[in-house]
């Protein structure tokens, strides 16, 4: 079986980490070789860029600067880790991909989807995930979960309106793209994981 690239998306506190662990266990039980990656990050250089993005700076970080750092990290990961793994027929499970930038920078930062699409075309070309699972959680609930984990980073400290714009952009894009499956992440963890595994079975097997 050829390699597949599955991405788990969602706001802070949506439950991406536990969902990824569930997907990995499910696929490995089928005898599939699986690699996991995260964005931003995933290579030494990309992890350094992640630190720059999340750090709390004394100066204002331009939304465009933030966006370009995200894509620099993303290209490094795709070219050095994801594409080589797929070429070896391994499955890659990603904690975020460029849908995050379209939602967070395009929606939350209000840069607009036209700019995001142009940058995506320049940096990634026609490379896209085989399936994206969007864990949709109510903004307040997601932020409460994130705060319970500990100290928030620069982006996690944004106000509620930022996350409302981000969530709405996620849902608007998903409504027009059949490769993005929306999962209700307000359910119990067990129900969320079952919904995810059903979607994977339906769309990729």
Curated annotation (Swiss-Prot):
One of its GO terms (cellular component) is cytosol. Its EC number is 2.7.4.9. Pfam families: Thymidylate_kin. ATP binds at residues 10-17. Keywords: ATP-binding, Kinase, Nucleotide biosynthesis, Nucleotide-binding, Transferase. It catalyses: dTMP + ATP = dTDP + ADP. This is Thymidylate kinase. It comes from Idiomarina loihiensis (strain ATCC BAA-735 / DSM 15497 / L2-TR).
